[in-house]
Amino acid sequence: MKHPSATPELVIFDCDGTLVDSEVVAARAWSEYVAGYGVTLSPEDALARFRGVSMKWCISHIEQLHGQPLPAHFEQELRALMGGMLEQHLQPISGAVEIVEQLHVPFALASNAPHHKIELCLRVTGLLPHFAGRIFSAYDVQRWKPDPALFLFAAERLGVAPQRCAVVEDSLPGVQAGLAAGMQVIALQEHGVHPELPAEVAVITHLAQLRAKLG
């Protein structure tokens, strides 16, 4: 694994699966909701298929399984179900609160999710005050990971060159976006390393290990 030669000037965190344990909750919502359309999708399958990808991609996949287009209200109702479940069950990823309280490097958040979902997740987990004014959504640029546009947008808005940024991600699309942006990438792999993870990516298994990787 490669290590940075100098401490980055900006750390850009992903949200889902990196700071908040929302992907497990969202997978349960997917499984429950699509059952009403006659689609069998276990929470485990939803988690494996939908980790780190856009809502548009997920809906397209469900339409293929369903065999016909889904109604216009599908996304709105699904997001409402997810929102309620997140309010009730969402927890921060282990070490997330501590790392944002202790990190001495400026940091931001960049997620494929819309702002309202990001802010919901951060509010429920107590992380929102730490990211005031530094939250970026793929909906801001209309480009979703693995496209690097979101990370480049965040770096530009905060006045930091891409090569001086470090990205912290849990998903392969997020890792690919960070690499394509020319940034250092650190992958949080709590449950085993993804077999397709590029060799140049530094790996941590707990957020407590992040500071050591930042140099």
Regions found by a protein language model. Give the residues of each.
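Short, acidic loop-to-helix structural element flanking the phosphoryl-transfer center
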Residues: G84-L109, H115-E119
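Metal-dependent phosphoesterase signature
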Residues: S60-E98
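Asp-based, Mg2+/Mn2+-dependent phosphohydrolase catalytic module
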Residues: M1-E9, V105, P114-G215
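Helix-loop "lid/cap" segments that line or gate small-molecule binding pockets
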Residues: Y33-V34, S54-Q68, C121, A155
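Anion (oxyanion) recognition and catalysis
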Residues: A35, E101, L179
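An amphipathic alpha-helix signature
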Residues: A27, S31, L47, M55-S60, ...
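Active-site neighborhood of HAD-like aspartate-dependent phosphohydrolases
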Residues: K2-A48
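Short beta->alpha linker loops
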Residues: V25, F50-S54, E77, Q91-G95, ...
